[in-house]
Amino acid sequence: MYHSIKRFLIGKPLKSQAAGEQKLTKLKALAMLSSDALSSVAYGTEQILIILATISAAAFWYSIPIAVGVLILLLALILSYRQIIYAYPQGGGAYIVSKENLGEKPGLIAGGSLLVDYILTVAVSISAGTDAITSAFPALHDYHVPIAIFLVLVIMILNLRGLSESASILAYPVYLFVVALLVLIAVGLFKLMTGQIDQPAHHTSLGTPVAGITLFLLLKAFSSGCSALTGVEAISNAIPAFKNPPARNAARTLAMMGILLAILFSGITVLAYGYGTAPKPDETVVSQIASETFGRNVFYYVIQGVTSLILVLAANTGFSAFPQLAFNLARDQYMPRMFTVRGDRLGFSNGIIFLGFASIVLIILFGGQTEHLIPLYAVGVFIPFTLSQTGMCMKWIKQKPKGWIGKMLINSCGALISFMVLSILFVTKFNVVWPVLIFMPIVVLLFFAIKNHYTAVGEQLRIVDKEPEEIKGTVVIVPVAGVTTVVQKSIHYAKSLSDQVIAVHVSFDREQEKKFEKRWEELNNGVRLVTLHSSYRSLVHPFDKFLETVEAKAKKEQFSVMVLFPQFITKKRWHTILHNQSAFLLRVRLFWKKDIMVATLPYHFKK
């Protein structure tokens, strides 16, 4: 049943040789890895206007120079990450760059920031998309969290089916969103230039002095507008997912994403200024622009529909980049090794599943209202932005390749602007982003704890010249609850392993104890029976004390100790709950006894 459902949802397993077929073309990669960045167009301009609106609508013209500043940062980031892609074609992005050029701790800070950011990406994007759905269908408002969880599971399953297949499905809505917004911008600009739009009374021309405007407020608006740049780094983390040559294809995809993002963001910002659009609590800026441009007709609803869809699909960037980044960290032993294992469909399925359930936990904890996580989301991006650009500067200074000064200037510009935005975010939104100062050290400490564990394990597993202690034999202990054919087979097998076999029975009743001893004598199997009476009906405690005694004597004689458990394997799985799980309790207890071997002898029921 389980396997049938798994095959239906995820598909048939793929051979390792088919890994090349799961690689992404540039167009598929653009849809898979750029959905987060492109979706930010839906709210980037609005975030700027919300800050400017605290002064007055007359300040809206500042959105144009602020947008220019955002575009300059976008250009710096695209050029910088293009250099990272060619310098580190194995992927890893900010984590690898920071670790190799700035040191272990900066690398882990960058990697940890991105891991947390991808979890936030999924939670925030899905919640935003769910908001759009429940706004269109108010009757579903009470089911906000279940809908969000369902959407996370759908995208998780699509990614478990493999990169290529999920990209083929998700490409359509992403490109539909791009085309719809390009049409909106083109028609809107045409109407502006031909005077078909009536500008509101509060509309002011560029350069008009505005009372009360401050540098602090403009910087705050700029940092809010930089939310449009979230997701730019995803391509550099997932270079191995591209078809050959991966670095060149990734660089071209990054350039395509940058061009599209610049056109869409600047187009929406210009239209918002030209139309005099003011942010409203019950209607988005994009919705107002579409309504003003087309009226409430079919195309308006198409734009609203694809905008809602792209907000949901923005989560897919996290599902594409998180597993690859987790693989890089796990390969360096900073995360559990399970993140290096490919699943049935050749994706890093453990990373995909972990991300899905971590984001579901966030959605449940915040009741689906994750808007106040957006500043954390932005900080989580600009920390690795700053570290990776600084790391690249150090790389060029150390190596001094041909043309290194120009390359260093590009990365220096990116590092400086990213650091400025990060500083502005901390200064202007400290009351929201302060948790970063707590959870990032915790994440880094967790990385070190995992690394220390693997290092300690490696030291203990290393073969040394010292000869191991000679073992003269083994004492095999067989716990028995009754005189059955299962016990007979277990005793017979134990005797094939050693001459030193002891059967142990824990009794709660004196009369039953005597009856059991009598039946054991009748078997005449030549194996000594030890009966342990438990006055307090504890199975584990008397057995544990007996083992301590046997273990102490065995050590003196240079004997090892093995406990052999007979185990029932029922024909139907649900039958298992009908049987006493005492053997399981004893086994769990023995796992922590380092000098005792534990073995299980299964007995399969036929009916």
UniProtKB/Swiss-Prot annotation:
Disulfide bonds: none annotated. Potassium uptake increases at lower external pH and is abolished by the proton ionophore carbonyl cyanide m-chlorophenylhydrazone (CCCP). Binds cyclic di-AMP (c-di-AMP), which inhibits the potassium transport activity. The chain crosses the membrane at residues 31-49, 63-84, 106-134, 143-162, 167-190, 215-238, 250-271, 299-323, 348-366, 373-393, 406-428, 432-447. Keywords: Cell membrane, Ion transport, Membrane, Metal-binding, Potassium, Potassium transport, Symport, Transmembrane, Transmembrane helix, Transport. One of its GO terms (cellular component) is plasma membrane. High-affinity potassium transporter. Functions as a K(+)/H(+) symporter. Belongs to the amino acid-polyamine-organocation (APC) superfamily. This is Potassium transporter KimA. It comes from Bacillus subtilis (strain 168).
